Amino acid sequence: MVKIGSHVSMNGKKMLLGSSEDAVQYGANTFMIYTGAPQNTRRKPIEELNIEAGTEHMKANGIQDIVVHAPYIINIGNSIKPATFELGVNFLKNEIDRTEALGAKQIVLHPGAHVGEGAEKGIPKIIEGLNEVLDPNSNVQIALETMAGKGSEIGRTFEELAQIIEGVTHNDRLSICMDTCHIHDAGYNIVEDFDGVLEQFDKIIGIDRLKVVHVNDSKNERGAHKDRHENIGFGYIGFEALHNIVHHPQLSDLPKILETPFVGTDKKNKKPPYKHEIEMLKEGNFDPHLKEKIMEA
């Protein structure tokens, strides 16, 4: 059975229990959460995350291999502002503690941005930060995400990610999250030659490091370096290629996580597409009228 889910929120009093309930409603058997708002550092204490009730609900409903995503504000690639780097290191340590408490094994991290100083300065800074953060005795791995190459993002090529991994002391605590929109926007031809892309990944990084897949279509043509997610089948990657990736035999054990946009033009009335997209990807049938159906439901 394919391991597929989506990003779900974790908030209110229910916290982890609410996340699991949403995932089950979507027909998922895994999910990804932020431990709080991705744009800030405000977090509830671990004892208020409702972990016990959430874990029981997950077990009862066959949910496993959940994933945590670190917030966007962490940038350990910043070599200009020491305060930004230190904030990133300290907050990431706390996020790993929360990830472990939640029972997740993977925390996805955008590697960082060099803020105009060039990858030759950003990459050593990321290595320095990861060396401060990683605990060889932890059960959690940091899954470095493949990036689209927007702005000064680092991680736009497999080579950049490999360079980071090679520089880190306890790099057995590092894994990779492959985002389909990001690698498409970075220039990799996943539409016509996903097997070739995987082969390249295996040679440069090693397929064993791949632990999470973000399944997103793209609003942009290959190589655009934009990072704008589109709903499954409505973008430049297309349904067939994404269905192939979700069901690829080399990725069968990995959680596939949808981060596609909510549907609707009215900002106050947008609806999650995940139940419908998960169903489409499981069954292999693309519905070109999906967006209208979601809004009519």
Swiss-Prot record:
Its EC number is 3.1.21.2. CDD domains: AP2Ec. GO terms for molecular function: deoxyribonuclease IV (phage-T4-induced) activity; DNA binding; DNA-(apurinic or apyrimidinic site) endonuclease activity; phosphoric diester hydrolase activity; zinc ion binding. Its cofactor is Zn(2+). Coiled coil: none annotated. Zn(2+) 2 binds at residues 145, 179, 214, 259. It catalyses: Endonucleolytic cleavage to 5'-phosphooligonucleotide end-products. Keywords: DNA damage, DNA repair, Endonuclease, Hydrolase, Metal-binding, Nuclease, Zinc. The keyword Nucleotide-binding does not apply. The keyword Repressor does not apply. It holds the Pfam family AP_endonuc_2. Binds 3 Zn(2+) ions. Belongs to the AP endonuclease 2 family. PANTHER family: APURINIC-APYRIMIDINIC ENDONUCLEASE, ENDONUCLEASE IV ENDODEOXYRIBONUCLEASE IV. NCBIfam families: nfo, PRK01060.1-1. This is Probable endonuclease 4. It comes from Oceanobacillus iheyensis (strain DSM 14371 / CIP 107618 / JCM 11309 / KCTC 3954 / HTE831). The gene is nfo.
